[in-house]
Regions:
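Membrane-interfacial amphipathic/re-entrant helices at transmembrane-helix boundaries
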Residues: 1-16, 45, 54-59, 85-91, ...
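Inter-helical junctions in multi-pass inner-membrane proteins, predominant
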Residues: 1-13, 155, 188-225, 232, ...
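Membrane-embedded helix boundary and interhelical linker motif in transport proteins
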Residues: 5, 27-73, 77
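Short, non-helical or kinked segments that cap or interrupt transmembrane helices
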Residues: 21-42, 56, 86-90, 160-163, ...
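Alpha-helical transmembrane segments within multi-pass membrane transporters and channels
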Residues: 54-99, 239-244, 275-276
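Transmembrane helix-bundle core of multi-pass membrane transporters
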Residues: 81, 88-157, 184, 250, ...
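Cytosolic-side transmembrane-helix boundaries in multi-pass membrane proteins
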Residues: 110, 169-176, 180-183, 255-286
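Helix-loop-helix "hairpin" substructures at the membrane interface of multi-pass membrane proteins
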Residues: 132-210, 234-240
Length: 286
């Protein structure tokens, strides 16, 4: 497959993850660095269900459910109590980093350090615009497109989506206008967690093989995509994911693939230094 094809698949997976990550940050004001850990744990839940003879496409729903439940629990048990104490935002970020380390290395202690793979067929290979894509990769792109359309519909045309946007813009004003902000925040954790679980599973499908620390550098890609598009901007996150996915994979054709995350890190540093509110955000976003 061409580097553009690899970039397209990477962007599709990253788009699902980044949109959930951005929504979570925008509505809840929590920069959840444990997002990658929840992704890989969800991928393993899908793997365990798949090992019992269930199709990976059905087992995928177990991963989505895991991401939603774990994210909701993290908010209720850990993040909300810290936020109620009116601590500095960086404190919650550090707490989320600790949660990430516990989630990743706790999983590694349970499953070991060996690589695993799903029981699935890659399907026929298709030639399209100079790219060779497997059936699974085409399905992943289709899932990404479907999810992004659903997120657009949710945010634009539903009462829940409008309440989420209002809570993100001004939580106190939304509360005074009758929006049940705590309920909206809980629903945001569930929805973004479901996206996290889905992203973890399709990430593992695309990787072919994975292990407990496969998410190690993924948070850098998430942060780069989010800050490129704009913190709290779901549509910006879609663009950021496409740009980061393509740039990291295309650059891997010219430098060793082991260092392709460096491109994302440089983008992240550049955005933080010169335009921290992103290409699609505004200064009031931060």
């Amino acid at each position: 497959m061409s580097s553009f094809g690899f970039g397209l698949i990477t962007a599709a997976v990253l788009a699902i993850a980044t949109v959930g990550f951005t929504m979570q940050f925008a509505v809840t004001n929590v920069l959840n660095l444990a997002y990658g850990s929840v992704m890989i744990n969800s991928a393993y839940v899908t793997y365990w269900v798949n090992q019992h003879g269930i199709s990976v496409w059905l087992a995928l729903f177990a991963g989505v459910f895991c991401g939603a439940v774990v994210s909701w629990c993290l908010n209720r048990v850990i993040y909300t109590p810290f936020q109620r104490r009116n601590l500095a935002p960086i404190t919650v970020v550090i707490v989320s980093l600790g949660v990430d380390l516990m989630g990743t290395f706790g999983l590694q202690a349970i499953v070991g350090g060996s690589y695993v793979t799903y029981k699935m067929s890659q399907g026929h290979e298709f030639h399209f615009l100079g790219m060779f894509l497997s059936g699974v990769q085409l399905i992943i792109i289709g899932i990404c497109a479907g999810v992004l359309i659903l997120i657009h519909w949710l945010l634009k045309y539903t009462r829940l989506g409008k309440a989420m946007r209002a809570t993100s813009a001004n939580r106190n004003l939304a509360r005074n206008s009758g929006v049940k902000t705590q309920f909206i925040i809980s629903m945001t954790w569930i929805i973004s967690g479901a996206l996290c679980g889905l992203a973890g599973t399709v990430f593992a499908m695309n990787s072919g093989v994975f292990e407990a620390t496969s998410n190690e550098l993924y948070i850098v890609l998430l942060l780069a995509a989010m800050f490129l598009g704009g913190p709290g901007e779901p549509y910006g996150a879609m663009f950021g994911a496409l740009a980061i996915g393509l740039s990291t994979e295309i650059s891997a054709a010219y430098i060793t693939a082991d260092y392709k995350e460096v491109i994302a890190f440089l983008v992240l540093l550049g955005m933080l230094a010169f335009r921290p509110y992103g290409l699609f955000g505004s200064e009031k976003t931060l």
